[in-house]
Amino acid sequence: LSIFVASRATTEDAFDQSELQENGRIAMRLLTQDLKWAGFWGDYTGSPMAVGQGVTLSAGSSVLAANDCLDNLGRGSLPPSVGTNRGIWVAGVDNSRAITGGAFACIPVASRIANTDVISIKRLIGLPLADAAATGNRFYLATTTQAAQMFKGGETVPAMTPERQLWEYQHFIYYLSPNAAGNPELRKRYLTANGGSVLISGPMAEGIERMTVLFGVDDSPVPDGEIDRYVATANVTEQEWSEGRVVAARIFILVRSLQASSSYVNNNVYQVGSTSVSGNGDGFRRLLLESSVSLRNPAVMAGGGA
């Protein structure tokens, strides 16, 4: 009997470890890939990503506030008329599940997990498109090095110049949410032209218990793109965001097994970025993962002004 119990415990441990690694790998790959491309606007590099400063919007390029995901400054998915378009912005969910500055009301309070981060990423997707492809339920950006024109799928494609490129424009939001069974999951919202910000059906990865980002900040009087310090999300100032001084991200995710084990007691303490998470003696196995990403596009495109 003792041999059987030991064998079962070993099998259970191996299964949990495999599950943790696979869920963690999927989550980290999704996050790092999108973070690498945050603030990517194709060949448009001449001016800030803001309406009236190189960017124009078509008549159909609008999203109702009720269908959008607004940040702490009230800016939504599309380029604003005041201030610049944040290619990346991260907000914290506090212990009462409130989000920094009242941001992202698109995420119901019941669908939030306390003491985690919400990651907002705006960027262009994939490779330049043929004009005939710009017909879907999406927003598109026609770009040159000096100008960018946004339009809705099905509208007339901006003529601009023969050298212009055509891209799909997206706004992704990653956050953690409990499922019906109470297990934590990584969820993702994306932008549509007809419905605004829409939640992708089903989790992107299961068992993601915590997600925290530390940011590398360039403090040089004249920004040189070098990291001078890492700070928690809450300690990045509005000026540092808008001036492109946030040049790197360190992503921490804590993955938890989907079921507790009767043969395991977790008394470990995990340092998830700036937050310590205790196993509290429960039966869930956990795995802490970390990865770093350079944020070159926001630094290049920073135009100043909040």
Label the predicted regions.
Residues 1-40:
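Aliphatic-rich helix starts adjacent to a transmembrane/signal segment
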Residues 27-248, 252, 258-285, 290, ...:
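N-terminal pilin/flagellin-like segments and related low-complexity appendage regions
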